[in-house]
Amino acid sequence: MLPGLFPLALRLARKHAIGAIRISHEESRLRAVLSSGGELNTSVLLKQGIQARGLKLLARDAREMAERAGISSTDYFCGIAQTGVLTREGVERLLETLPEGTTELMCHPGYVDEDLRQTRTRLQGSRQTELEILTDTSVRKIVATRGIRLINYGFLAQAA
């Protein structure tokens, strides 16, 4: 989020009792781990990786600002560089190497329906793929074996 907008987002979150907010501060190590496997589209990953680095720079003070405002966030965030090109292998590797704490994997799983077909998003085909990745037996097995707890932002707000 742009630095000038983040204080406004925090004020609105407090005003409307929203206890947690996304901070798009993507760690390079997590981005690298998630980029593994499959047939990678290197030009897309390069472009989106540059965007992720830019967002990381813009978000460098966001965590401290959110803490001062009493708004929770995840400890780690990843997935921007892989938007639309997420792979099962990358998700598996990420799950196997998660750091201690909470990590948001930003993705867009879903079904392609008539409403989605009417939009001008390049993420139409990848939604079904990401849904299949996240519900894949091998991915679910890693989650269970490693004791990974799947949560949402509501949990973050309650845990604070």
Place the predicted regions along the sequence by residue.
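Active-site pocket-lining segments that scaffold enzyme catalytic pockets across diverse folds
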Residues: 1
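Terminal accessory/targeting
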Residues: 7-160
